[in-house]
Amino acid sequence: MSAPANFNGQTPKIDPANAAMLLIDHQSGLFQTVKDMPMTELRANATTLAKVATLAKIPVITTASVPQGPNGPLIPEIHEAAPHAQYVARKGEINAWDNPEFVAAVKATGKKQLIIAGTITSVCMAFPSIAAVHDGYQVFAVIDASGTYSKMAQEITLARVVQAGVVPMDTAAVCSEIQRTWNRDDAVQFAEAYSAVFPHYQLLIESYAKAQAVVNNHEQLVSQRK
C-alpha cells in the first residue's frame, strides 16, 4: 500500500489551521445516481462537513458540474451550513482541478491540506484529489460524503486514491480530528453535528441533558418518592 503523499514522514492528520474544504458536485441530479450508500446519509454527511468547517473557520470552496443540465443544482444545505463558502463556476470541466479559477481559489486560501468530498466518488472526488496530491497538497478524501453508482466503483476508487497518496477518511473522523477536544466553547454544536452523521448519538445527548437537569434542578428521583 502506498504511503500518504506530501507528509514528509509526519503523521497524516488534519490541521484545522492549515486546511481548506472542497465540496465538489453535491448536486441533486447526481445524487439520484448514487447506489453505494443511502442518499439521505450522503446528504447529511456533506452538510455536516460544511457545518463543522464553519465552526472551525475552515475555508470552504464549492463547485458544480453543468448545474443547468441533468446533473442539477448544488444541494442548498451546503451553503446554508457554510455561508462563508466560495462557489466557483466551471466551464464544463469534468475534473474541477482542470478549471483554473477553481485551482486559483484553492491556492488563495494559503492552506496546504485539502479535505475533499464529491459526487460521484470515482470522478468528482477522485480526479481533483489525485491532481492536488500531484501539485503538492496533503489530501484527505471523505468517502462517506462522496457517493457513486455502485459499491464496486467505490472500492476501486478507494484503492486508486490510496495508491496516489490520498488519505481516506469518514465524516465522523474528519469532524473529530478538526474538533480535537470536548474542552471548547462550541462542543455542543459539534455534538449536534455528530448526531446528523449517526442519529443514535442524539439519544445520548438527550439522556445526558436530562441527567444534568436532574442534578441542577435538584429533582427528586422516582425511586426516592414515598
What kind of region is each of these model predictions?
Residues 113-171:
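A contiguous pocket-lining binding segment that forms or flanks enzyme active sites
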Residues 45-48, 101, 124-127:
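Well-ordered alpha-helical segments embedded in enzymatic catalytic cores
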Residues 2-92, 108, 138, 155-162, ...:
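Active-site acidic carboxylates
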Residues 106-112:
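Glycine-rich phosphate-binding loop signature in dinucleotide/nucleotide-binding domains
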Residues 71-78, 102-103, 128-130:
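Distinct, well-ordered alpha-helical segments
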Residues 91-104:
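Short phosphate-binding loop-to-helix
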